[in-house]
Amino acid sequence: NEVLKAAGTKWNFLNFFPGLVGGHCIGVDPYYLAFKSEELGYTPEMILAGRRINDSMPTFIVSQIVKQLMKQNKNSQNASALILGATFKENCPDLRNSKVVDVYKELDEFGFNVDIYDPEADPEVFVKEYGFEKLGKLTNKQYDVVILAVSHTCFKAINPKELLVEEGVVFDVKGFYQDPDFLYL
């Protein structure tokens, strides 16, 4: 965040944040370009490196969460996690190639009990595309971990700390809340 803030002093700086890159264009199209480039004898190292980094983000995010729980002497087995956001970008109902699903699957592999809440995503499409359900609404349930995966504007009305058990962990993927107590990329 400090690097992005400093870079923002340049008049023509575009402020892009690290996060979960999905969707049809950025998640897929670089492979078309790489394929054609390699057909013509050129290996686009930078494009492929970018895709490797983007594809590894779900694993990185979950590893940071598990490490934080371990520091607190907590086990991921049967820990509860809430993922806020399922779509591939904010304020959009599109679920295509969403990396949030990969975060869900990684958490599940570590033994977490995972809920997903996304008022923007169509629940029927979500079940059809990914085979599991999302929460229709938030309840009074408290979680060991809350992950803000997608920065929907409607999430500004949510205080993630109110969704946590004591000493719970919030991982704010996009730096949406700017809270010093949260984990960030």
Indicate residue ranges for each PLM-predicted region:
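Structural/interface elements that position substrates and couple domains in central-metabolism enzymes
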Residues: N1-L185
